[in-house]
Amino acid sequence: MEKLDKLSEAFKALLKQEKFGSQSEIVTALQELGFENINQSKVSRMLSKFGAVRTRNTKMEMVYQLPAELGVPTTSSPLKNLVVDIDHNDVLIVVKTSPGAAQLIARLLDSMGKSEGILGTIAGDDTIFITPTKVTPVEVLMQNVTELFESSF
């Protein structure tokens, strides 16, 4: 197994433990496993690459965790259950989610792209801002996003 593959496997195994609340804790754990050249910026890139998000574990601690499913999430997954509210103003749409779910849902919305009227998204822990393309009225995109999650907001 290549060194990069071993690093990826070790990284995923550590995140599955759901006990690392900071990137420096992950760096230390990987160094203890023999990856001496690991640093915070590499860990940050790996967190992004694997779509990891900070969420609460069973002890209610904020920890890094891998998404339940890798790849592009679909609307057949229980993501729609994570959407709490959808609202808009004249220029953008705001989606409120359960804590820790915004980045995963934003990934789904970003994968839809400009053809569906989405110029881009910005996601925090539990809030997503959606900017429509120039040619898509915000009300139309609001309706499309609402229908996507089969909710009655």
From Swiss-Prot:
Pfam families assigned to the protein according to its UniProt record, in alphabetical order: Arg_repressor (PF01316), Arg_repressor_C (PF02863)
Pathway: Amino-acid biosynthesis; L-arginine biosynthesis [regulation]
Gene3D superfamilies: 3.30.1360.40, Winged helix-like DNA-binding domain superfamily/Winged helix DNA-binding domain
Keywords attached to this entry: Amino-acid biosynthesis, Arginine biosynthesis, Cytoplasm, DNA-binding, Repressor, Transcription, Transcription regulation
Any one GO molecular-function label of the UniProt entry: DNA binding
Coiled coil feature spans: none
Domain of life, source organism: Bacteria
Protein name: Arginine repressor
Annotated InterPro entries: Arg_repress (IPR001669), Arg_repress_C (IPR020899), Arg_repress_C_sf (IPR036251), Arg_repress_DNA-bd (IPR020900), WH-like_DNA-bd_sf (IPR036388), WH_DNA-bd_sf (IPR036390)
Alphabetical list of HAMAP family matching this protein: Arg_repressor (MF_00173)
Biological-process GO terms, alphabetical: L-arginine biosynthetic process; protein complex oligomerization; regulation of arginine biosynthetic process
Source organism: Actinobacillus pleuropneumoniae serotype 7 (strain AP76)
Gene: argR
Disulphide linkage map: none
Localisation per UniProt entry: Cytoplasm
Homology family: Belongs to the ArgR family.
One GO cellular component, as annotated: cytoplasm
